[in-house]
């Protein structure tokens, strides 16, 4: 009896569905180079139709009200060259392999608006010049949606991935954040960032029989930043891959962790940081994008 030939793995979804790639907090310039390189390479291979950024890709350290802790932080406080330019270069790279990017603003990007609104007189005129929304949106070649941190209406800022699945930056930093998010979201599943921890909570509606879940894929920033030097974190590097039916009524997710500069995709392929490290190093040196 002849053995059945094994099919060659095919990256990407089958007809009738598409891939949505979820990218959590990055905190440029305090990003983890190896984790980011893995993400860039995986994005190249998978070519998701939609790419959703959960916010805090800019640390906005220059706009922080917290005191500095080191000379390294002082050098990092160059908002345009140290944060905006690398982020724009990264967004341009992602545009090469996706049809749409959704950027959900985080509390760190909101630092800019919060500080500018405290200024008086002519200083208010600089608000638009330093707005993360304007700085990151200008010059985009693909469809780009920026969702502000503070809503213009009573509806909380969110992005609808599927009929019963939303993405938000994060509503709480609680220890059991996933359970709290699901409690708040009620009859929606929710993927969130903000907490930097990999966490999941699932519940079933006993009346309708539907299952809902809330989860955080982790983060892409340094796992032990300077301000946590004497407080070991339980942060984890990771992303989420969500396969969504084109009618957006059904979906399933896979959230690979990134460990020691590598991760494994759903088809078993191992992605390593060295495959895209050259781009990350160029991104860090870029002055414009």
Where on the chain are the PLM-derived regions?
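Conserved beta-sheet core of the metallophosphoesterase superfamily
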Residues: 164-256
């Amino acid at each position: 009896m002849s053995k059945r030939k094994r099919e060659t793995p095919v990256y990407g979804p089958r007809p009738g569905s598409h891939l949505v790639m979820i990218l959590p907090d990055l905190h440029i310039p305090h990003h983890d180079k190896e984790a980011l390189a893995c993400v860039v390479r995986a994005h190249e291979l998978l070519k998701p139709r939609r790419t959703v950024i959960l916010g805090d890709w800019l640390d906005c350290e220059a706009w922080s009200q917290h005191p500095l802790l080191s000379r390294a932080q002082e050098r990092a406080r160059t908002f345009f060259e140290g944060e905006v330019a690398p982020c724009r270069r990264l967004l341009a790279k992602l545009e090469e392999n996706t049809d749409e990017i959704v950027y959900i603003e985080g509390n760190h990007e909101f630092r800019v608006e919060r500080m500018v609104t405290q200024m008086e007189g002519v200083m208010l005129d600089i608000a638009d010049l330093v707005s993360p929304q304007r700085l990151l949106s200008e010059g985009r070649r693909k469809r780009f949606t920026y969702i502000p941190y503070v809503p213009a209406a009573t509806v909380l800022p969110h992005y609808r991935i599927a009929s019963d699945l939303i993405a938000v930056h994060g509503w709480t930093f609680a220890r059991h954040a996933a359970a709290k998010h699901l409690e708040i979201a009620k009859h929606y599943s929710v993927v969130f960032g903000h907490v930097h921890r990999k966490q999941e909570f699932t519940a079933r509606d006993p009346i309708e029989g539907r299952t809902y879940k809330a989860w955080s894929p982790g983060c892409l920033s340094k796992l032990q930043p300077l301000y946590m030097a004497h407080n070991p974190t339980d942060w984890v590097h990771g992303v989420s891959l969500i396969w969504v039916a084109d009618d957006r009524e059904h979906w399933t997710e896979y959230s690979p962790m990134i460990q020691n500069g590598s991760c494994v995709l759903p088809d078993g392929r191992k992605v390593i940081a060295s495959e895209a490290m050259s781009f990350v190093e160029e991104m860090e040196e870029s002055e414009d994008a």
